[in-house]
Amino acid sequence: MAKAKGNREKIKLVSSAKTGHFYTTEKNKRNMPEKMEIKKFDPVIRQHVIYKEAKIK
């Protein structure tokens, strides 16, 4: 029998500093329906900046 699809969705976290750097991660759509914003390190400018969620194409 086939396994049911999970609630987890792959997302891309894009730097708000417009450097083009991004992280990929997963999030649970049911527990967190809003867009994710998290502060992470951007190695291009060597600073902590806010990363915003974007869909993976």
From Swiss-Prot:
GO biological process, any: translation
Q: Per its record, what are the GO molecular function terms? A: structural constituent of ribosome
Q: Which UniProt keywords apply?
A: Ribonucleoprotein, Ribosomal protein
What GO CC annotations are associated with the protein? cytosolic large ribosomal subunit
| Chain coiled-coil ranges | none
Q: Does the keyword Transport apply?
A: no
Under InterPro entries, the record lists: Ribosomal_bL33 (IPR001705), Ribosomal_bL33_CS (IPR018264), Ribosomal_bL33_sf (IPR038584), Ribosomal_zn-bd (IPR011332)
Keyword Ribosomal protein among UniProt keywords: yes
One Pfam family from the record = Ribosomal_L33
**Domain of life the protein comes from:** Bacteria
Family according to the record: Belongs to the bacterial ribosomal protein bL33 family.
Name assigned to this protein:
Large ribosomal subunit protein bL33
What gene is this protein a product of?
A: rpmG
